[in-house]
Amino acid sequence: MSYQYPMDETWSTEEIIDVVNFFSLIEKAYEKQVDREEILALYRRFKQIVPSKSEEKKLFTQFQEASGYSSYHVVKKARETNESNIRM
């Protein structure tokens, strides 16, 4: 991994850790597989930190441009499936 996760300098240390954990799980969904409930739980926490839809879209775009992984598609798949594990 030779890129940085998108973040906001106004976030607390705990919030930064939670956002990094969310983006790390997105990576894992592409590289291995992840628990659907874990994705949804971390996304809910992400939305507490980033409630604005436009800010979410901006961060998702920055992450996708840096990593090639789409957070939007992982979250969408987790919401729409009943499978316990997600793999992209």
Swiss-Prot record:
Pfam families, per the entry: UPF0223 (PF05256)
Gene3D superfamilies: BH2638-like
Domain of life (superkingdom): Bacteria
InterPro entries named among the record's database cross-references: BH2638-like_sf, UPF0223
Family under the similarity heading: Belongs to the UPF0223 family.
Entry-linked NCBIfam families: PRK04387.1
Protein name: UPF0223 protein OB1419
